[in-house]
Amino acid sequence: MGNVIGIVAEYNPFHNGHARLIEQTRAQLGAVCPVVCVMSGDFVQRGSPAVYSKFARAEAAVRCGADLVLELPLPWSLSSAEGFARGAVGLLGSLGVVTHLSFGSECGELDPLQRVAEALLDPLLGEDLRAELRSGIPFAAARQQAIARRVGALAELLQAPNNILAVEYLKAIYDQRLELHPLTVLRTGAQHDRFAEGNIRSASELRMRIGAGEDVSAFLPRAAAEIFAREKTRGRGPVLPEALESALLSRLRMLPQTVYNALPGATEGLGNSLYRAAHEEPTLDGVLAAAKSKRYALARIRRMTMCAALGVTAGMDGGTPPYARVLAIGAQGRELLRAIDMRASVPVITKPAAGRSLPGPAGEIFALTADAHDLYVLGCPAREERRCGGDWRASPFVL
């Protein structure tokens, strides 16, 4: 087949900016180019539950222009920006049909992002980074200073969240030697966590408004707004972090210290700090604040906390996902799936029961991701929506 567009996303929630990325990419490559998305599941990279379930968000994506939505398994969804990008881009590459990777960025230009990505791949960078860290500055600042030695002012690109992910996508393409042609679209509307004018808002602002009970439908495509309104009416969302606090705290308090020391990122005593905090603090925010160190960002501690509660251990996010689970199928999705079935290097799962027969680590990761859904639904407003085992029963949404 011809060009196939790959997009990595969380769609937390799906908004007008996401629809714009699909439209503008098709404007460059052709209006009928199929779009396959790799999307985080019920828990997202910032270490929080998604405001709506992966099934609702995947349905919104295909109703708003995507043709196929695949789930990024839990260990990569809760990984660092580097691990998240490596897993998602690797999964797109393993399908055997994706020709282009499209992503938004605050920069909007490919060349500067590629220069920063190349600098990050410099084998000598680690030595410079360690030297910066010895001065006691936070990791992000140390990395930026080490990069600045190579690319000067371009290192400032790493201060913007979508630029950071864009650079990690490019690194993943280079590292894995994938034949994916990158495209970037200028991200308009709000910067991360800032208000903006017009009908595009950042996902972080929309989550804040949703948490406050505001109507955000003006900033969503109509189909997405209808889906999320349906989920709210049925008591399946929004799922807010505070709704899961008791479930998470009870889980964290039952875990032995060895589990904390085996978490992703549990270096320099972070595992011990998180263990102590989980057994002393009365709130989840208190746990995060007590475990936080000067060197590492709060998001890292939040991810570690969620990994502990959900059973994710160090090394699970190594390499790339060993299967492709289909969450939703859009207009060209069936044709796309037929092509993927012939060319993919990993099993393609359309019926969740097939996940039980996946061999070795693949089966373990599939089950772990399904178990995470059982914890996620405990945050649903309606008690009848909190049934266990739903991930094993759910079929892909078909447009």
Residue map of PLM features:
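N-terminal catalytic cores of NTP/NDP-binding nucleotidyl/phosphoryl-transfer enzymes
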Residues: 1-57
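Conserved acidic residues
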Residues: 3, 33, 67, 98-99
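Short, contiguous strand/loop micro-motifs
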Residues: 9, 44-45, 61, 75-76, ...
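Class I S-adenosyl-L-methionine
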Residues: 26, 58-62, 171-174, 207
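Structured loop/turn residues at beta-strand edges in well-structured enzyme cores
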Residues: 30, 64, 96
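A glycine-rich helix N-cap at a beta->alpha junction
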Residues: 58-73
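Active-site cores that bind ATP or allylic diphosphates and position pyrophosphate for catalysis
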Residues: 71-399
